[in-house]
Every structure is written in C-alpha cells, then in structure tokens.
Amino acid sequence: MEPQEGKTRFHDFNLAPELMHAIQDLGFPYCTPIQAGVLGFTLKGKDAIGRAQTGTGKTAAFLISIIEQLTQTPPPAERYMGEPRALIIAPTRELVVQIAKDAADLTKYTNLNVMTFVGGMDFDKQLKQLEARHCDILVATPGRLLDFNQRGEVHLDMVEVMVLDEADRMLDMGFIPQVRQIIRQTPHKGERQTLLFSATFTEDVMNLAKQWTTDPSIVEIESLNVASDNVEQHIYAVAGADKYKLLYNLVTDNGWERVMVFANRKDEVRRIEERLVRDGVNAAQLSGDVPQHKRIKTLEGFREGKIRVLVATDVAGRGIHIDGISHVINFTLPEVPDDYVHRIGRTGRAGADGVSISFAGEDDSYQLPAIEEKLGRKISCETPPTHLLRAVVRQTN
C-alpha cells in the first residue's frame, strides 16, 4: 500500500503478520481517523478514551489493539478455561454479536479464541463453549457476564485489556452498577489497559473514565462527518394520522428493497411492523422485546434481502452494520439529536449513497431545531406529494 499524504496505513504500525494478513483480507487499506488516533496510543500500552459514533471504524481500532497485545505476549502458563485475557463490554446483544463477528475476522490467522455472552440465548450452550477451550477475547453484555461471573464460571483476574463500548448508552440503559461490579473483579486499573468509547463526552461519561482509566489519551472524532455528505436528508411535514400511509406508499411505489424504519417506542415499532405485514410488505421488527435467536435470524434475513423493511427502536438499531440499506425512515423524530445521526448513519455506509426521510408531525416536529443544531445546518421541510398520502388498499388473501 503506497503512502498517501494525510493518511495512516496499518502497515505503518508494524503489526503482527497474522493480523496484517486478516486486515488485508478485509480490504482495509488506510486507517480511519479514529483508528489512526487510537492505535497511536494503545499499541504503546496506554489507556485511551475515544469519542466516535458507530460507522467510524472504532470497533476495528480496539480489536486490532487487543489482538496485537495478545499475539505479542504469551498467555500465562496456568489459567482456567474461563479466564479471558481481553474483555469487551457492550450494551446490546446486536453490538456484542457484531463485535464478535469482526473479532473472528481479525483473529482468523491467530490461535486466539473469541467468545460471546449475551442474554436471551441458551445459557448452557454459552457455558459449553467455555468448557471446550480457553477464552482469549470475551465480548459480553453486562447482565449475562455477571451471571457467569457470580456462578464462578468466569474469572476476570487475568484481564490484560478491557474495553467499554458505547459508555453513554450503558449509562442511559442503567447498566453502570453492573459494570462496576464486573470491573471490581478485574486487575487494578494500573495493571490492565482500559479503553472507553462513547458517542458523547458528557460529564457522567468523563467521571466514569476518570474512575476506570489511568492517565488516558483522549481521541475525539468530530461526529458531524458521520452524518455523511453521501446521505441525502429529507423531512416531510405530515400529520400523525397520515404517517403510515406515507410510509407504505413510499416503500411500495418506489420498489425500495432494503429500508430501515425507526420509531421511538417499542409499541410503535410493533404496530408499524404488524400493519406492513398485514398490507403485504415483507417486514420485521427489532426491539428489546424480541428474543435473541429471533433477532439474529431477523438481521440475517435483512442482510440477505429476504426482509424488505426492518422496523427498530434506537437501542435495538444501535450497532447494526449492514451495507446496502438504501433508505432510513424516521417514522418519529428522535428525542435525542445524537440518535438522529446514528439512525441516518445506517445508510450511506462504506462510501455508498443513501437517503434518509423523516416524518415531522404535530407530536415530534419540535425536535427539529435541536437536530439541525447538531448537524450544523437547516433541513428544509417538504410537503409530501398527494399521491403518497392515498389510502392503503387492504390486501385480500
């Protein structure tokens, strides 16, 4: 890979050959800004705090750092099967599964074993993987990890590197007491490397970082470039009663094949999905109420194009990395401007063009000024063409 001005190559970090081989297989030529920033510190063993949204390459940043550390340092001569050397804690099941998939891709030429613990999946099945081989990298949600830890199946006293991903989301979801319990089981902060990532640096997040890290390097990637220029943003002013008609007609008139629809509440997500299915659209839903095995099946179906419309809440939609999503529709505007950036970041990934369409009704249009302030620009409100507001003709079997 030729040197290019202003860009850092993975090659420049002198990584282990088996790791470089995996990076080349994935077709990553140059580091993203967060990768270049974080790796410059973490490969020297320093703690780091990174501010970056999903879609910036932060997952690969911390995984490359972990894998390099574990391949360069031999494992302890004696350890239990359930004593991971690296621990990654993330708030949602989808995010854990995605991180583990990326970790499997990056470790394929090494002897490192990656394991996942998530709630909603068979406890015994997860226990069997622990009993079968040593665990090098453990990716887990806080609750399920605590279950294993309290039952004495997992010991965290040999953790060399700990990563807390989406710390702001963990705060929002009330996971911090569980995370504290977990961290108490790991070596003292001066004896392990700690990396913390968050989409926002609130006072609460920085307080946690201070408690859990030692003299960390701070890497901030401006989030504005995540609402990327290749996502065309539209806002339709539409009455709440007309939102479903507009959604249905947009999808079916245009023949869109891979669409993500976001709503703020689980009951809204369920209602939208049920109506779409009733009206003959191949749709599925993702929310905290959907059992894990079904969520994984749903994501696979969406990735493979069997599911046309995926309706999700913000928490469930976080960390979904599926290329080829052509449109994101905000059925309701999010209450937190950061969530708007996250939502529209599901489309226009990997340099592709994408379109986001937001429905602003009487109940949620007041969120617009804060979203525009976050984006640093105005988005003009359009009136939808009348043919897109026509009544939905009920399907007859």
From Swiss-Prot:
Motif extent (DEAD box): 165-168
GO molecular function: ATP binding; ATP hydrolysis activity; RNA binding; RNA helicase activity
Primary localization class, coarse: cytoplasm
Every Helicase ATP-binding domain range: 39-219
Alphabetized UniProt keyword annotations: ATP-binding, Cytoplasm, Helicase, Hydrolase, Nucleotide-binding, RNA-binding
Binding site for ATP: A52, Q53, T54, G55, T56, G57, K58, T59
Any one biological process term the GO annotation gives: RNA catabolic process
Intracellular or extracellular location(s): Cytoplasm
GO cellular component: cytosol
Catalytic reaction annotation: ATP + H2O = ADP + phosphate + H(+)
Top-rank EC class of the record's enzyme: hydrolase
Helicase C-terminal domain location: 242-392
SMART domains: DEXDc, HELICc
Span(s) of short sequence motif Q motif: 8-36
Family named by the database record: Belongs to the DEAD box helicase family. RhlB subfamily.
Task of the protein: DEAD-box RNA helicase involved in RNA degradation. Has RNA-dependent ATPase activity and unwinds double-stranded RNA.
Assembly behavior: Component of the RNA degradosome, which is a multiprotein complex involved in RNA processing and mRNA degradation.
HAMAP family listed in its UniProt record: DEAD_helicase_RhlB
Protein name from the UniProt record: ATP-dependent RNA helicase RhlB
